[in-house]
């Protein structure tokens, strides 16, 4: 798949073409599957919920969950990936706890999908594996790009929500999809939907809004440009090697390696150059 962006400015024209997937950056290789662990600041009434490791994987950290294109199965013609599991920290030995930062016993944690930004016309989907047929999945709900008041939720805790129950949860089988290539930004928060708090309400107050990147396919998420310099930012995935190449002529191209090879690591990466050329074309390639 190819994405092309023409950017004229100050008499200077640079075209960017994405031919594969790209990555440049100093970070070390990361695993493709992560766990975001939900807990609370403490276990008292009205203590706020949070992701104990959210700062490692949110947009401020530049981490991206990669979605790869597929043309078969439940996710045919979609970008799909299961690179993140939303978990809840355990309070009991039976579930491997007590973990530091766990929510109060009796809390039932859910993740609310609030907002979505990304490529125009894109739709983000949340799917669940079919227990009776593990080879297939069914759609739970979608979030169109531009939504800012979403109310859909998925359970993070696995308990029955009864008083004193461990808030622990660790459920695999969820897949996330996108209909268009590009960088998607999910806004989400953790809720306690139990009725075991004061007055029959929740024990904990909601978390703040977390923002997470999902990179669908090989695209350039942003670029910067001045009179003699150009920079691009793009998402990556582990297990790939990346090259940034450039040429001054597309009719008779002589592609030269501008940066790379670099290992992918599931973080947004940046490449910048200084050039006096009036026209340059860049492409991003992986193998």
Regions found by a protein language model. Give the residues of each.
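Short tyrosine-centred short linear motifs in exposed loops/low-complexity segments
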Residues: 172, 180-184, 240, 278
């Amino acid at each position: 798949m190819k994405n092309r962006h023409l950017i004229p400015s100050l008499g200077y024209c640079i075209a960017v073409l994405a031919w594969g997937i790209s990555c440049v950056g100093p970070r070390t290789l990361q695993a493709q599957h992560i766990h975001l662990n939900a807990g609370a600041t403490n276990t008292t009434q009205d203590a706020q919920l949070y992701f104990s490791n959210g700062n490692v994987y949110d947009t401020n950290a530049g981490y991206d969950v990669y979605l790869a294109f597929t043309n078969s199965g439940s996710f045919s013609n979609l970008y799909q990936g299961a690179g993140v599991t939303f978990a809840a920290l355990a309070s009991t030995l039976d579930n491997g706890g007590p973990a530091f930062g766990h929510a109060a016993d009796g809390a039932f944690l859910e993740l609310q999908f609030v907002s979505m930004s990304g490529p125009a016309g894109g739709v983000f989907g949340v799917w669940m594996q079919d227990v009776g047929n593990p080879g297939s999945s069914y759609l739970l709900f979608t979030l169109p790009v531009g939504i800012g008041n979403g109310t859909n939720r998925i359970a993070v805790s696995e308990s029955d929500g009864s008083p004193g129950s461990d808030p622990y949860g660790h459920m695999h089988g969820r897949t996330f999809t996108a209909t268009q290539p590009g960088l998607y930004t999910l806004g989400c928060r953790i809720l306690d939907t139990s009725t075991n708090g004061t007055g029959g309400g929740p024990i904990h107050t909601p978390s703040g809004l977390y923002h997470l990147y999902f990179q669908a396919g090989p695209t350039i998420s942003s670029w910067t440009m001045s009179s003699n310099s150009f920079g691009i930012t793009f998402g990556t995935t582990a297990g790939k090697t990346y090259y940034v190449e450039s040429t001054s002529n597309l009719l008779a191209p002589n592609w030269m390696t501008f940066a790379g090879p670099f290992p992918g690591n599931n973080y947004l990466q940046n490449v910048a150059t200084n050039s006096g050329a009036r026209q340059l074309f860049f492409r991003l390639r992986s193998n």
